[in-house]
Amino acid sequence: LDDPKHLLLMIKRGFYVPKTYVPENLTAVQIPVAHNDGNNLMRKDAADALESMYKDAKKQGLILAINSAYRPYNEQQQVYDEYMVTYGVQTAVKLVAEPGCSEHQLGLSVDLTSQSVMDGTYAVFGQQMNRAISVM
C-alpha cells in the first residue's frame, strides 16, 4: 500500500508521502472550528465519518470542535520545527509527526477539542470525555 489515496496507507517515519501530495477530495467538515482559521478540511470519507461522530457526541452532551485538520507538508514542517525549538528533539519526535509522514497531510487526521474547553468549563478535553463516559 504505497498509494496516498488509499485509506490504509502506511504512513510513519520511513514511510513518506511526497511533499507535493494534496488529497483530491478535500471538503470542509461541517462542525465547529476552535480557532476560526478555516482549518476544517478533510478527505470526504473522513469528513463524513467525523460529522456522524459529532452528531452522536452531541446527543451525549459533548460539543466537539476541530483544532486542526488537513495540513500540507509545509505547514507540518512549521509545526515540527516549532516543537523542536520549544520542547527539544526528544519530546518533539513523540508529539509531532515528521513532515511527509503525517496523516494530517493525507486529510485523514483531525485534532479535536470541545466547546467546554474553549469556554473554560474544562481545562482539558479528556476531563470532559471521562465525565461523559462515566454517566453513560
Label the model's feature ranges.
Residues 1-69, 73-136:
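Extracytoplasmic cell-surface/polysaccharide-interacting catalytic and binding patches
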